[in-house]
Swiss-Prot record:
CDD domains assigned to the protein according to its UniProt record, in alphabetical order: Peptidase_M17
Originating gene: pepB
Domain of life: Bacteria
Protein name: Peptidase B
Positions bound to Mn(2+) 2: K195, D200, D218, E279
Family affiliation: Belongs to the peptidase M17 family.
Record GO cellular component, one term: cytoplasm
Keyword Manganese attributed: yes
Organism, scientific name: Citrobacter koseri (strain ATCC BAA-895 / CDC 4225-83 / SGSC4696)
Amino acid sequence: MTEAMKITLSTQPADARWGDKATYSINNDGITLHLNGKDDSGLIQRAARKIDGLGIKHVQLTGAGWDVERSWAFWQGYKGPKGSRKVEWPDLDDEKRKELDNRLTIIDWVRDTINAPAEELGPEQLAQRAVDLLCSVACDHVSYRITKGEDLREQNYMGLHTVGRGSDRAPVLLALDYNPTGDKDAPVYACLVGKGITFDSGGYSIKQSAFMDSMKSDMGGAATVTGALAFAITRGLNKRVKLYLCCADNLISGNAFKLGDIIHYRNGKNVEVMNTDAEGRLVLADGLIDASAQKPELIIDAATLTGAAKTALGNDYHALFSFDDALAGRLLASAAEENEPFWRLPLAEFHRNQLPSNFAELNNTGSAAYPAGASTAAGFLSHFVENYQQGWLHIDCSATYRKAPVEQWSAGATGLGVRTIANLLTA
């Protein structure tokens, strides 16, 4: 390994020779990042991306000014999907170093899992990886059940079974119980539900290649809520939380579901399929039914659900939907504390009624007359949350993954959202 490049911080502007807007400069001692007090974390992250682009793979963060947040900002920009990198971290006290180490372990797990090729990460592998992560932080308090294939149909998990039956890799439901109380009858404080589509071709409503090439990341919601639970545990979560991951491939075959099919759910709802590429909501519905049955104070679902959310917010913000204004405010406050970008989008009672079907109670996609696709998708999900007006948050994970590098991120997964959800769980 080469000698580490030293990275220091300064509140002084760079020498004029580097230009008026220089964020870093190079000298015989290493690289200096020049902070301006406006968005120091963002500046550090962007500078780290540039340093990685120079081919520097071994750095030492040294000198005054390096704390947990600045160290983490550097790593967010420095980490990439190819090759290895080594960072010698600054001196931190034990508590702060533990916080940094937990971020490195858990959020890197989220990023690496989302970046994994679909060939390596099928529905069952995703569920098992989630179990392994959570057992690594709290195995004594974790129990779980994996239901897959025809067992899903027999137990009436019809959304998940319908979407996943077209693949040779069986669909899977992971139901995991984190119960630190030791009381098997303890109330469930929160349920987390994640969309785990390990590859989304669109089914018979097939995607073009330009929209399919990143669909290994369509399990980003499942990875995010798994990481959030693990991270909350490391921060001292002492309440019972259940995790439901709805994992499947959405592929084309002679056994794949088709337009016009009607899915009959356990809560009595019937859904006509008019777009097989609107499959995420169909699998989440099963998880939300189970979550509602637990009568928790809080239900959070996370999913890379709609292109409409990305159209509205790009890849820079996660979209938040809720009927519960107070709860939405709490999540946005958690996001602000963790310096993670969330933006609330509209969800009103009328969005629940913008999914008309001629043959069933609901359609799985809105018609051209109702173009607010992210809001109607959230409205669809609300039909599977028993008390949807209170205690439920839906996160459309538009900031989970980037197809191409930008100035602050490499291509691939970001890990954004993990800390915010963990913060809310432990508040």
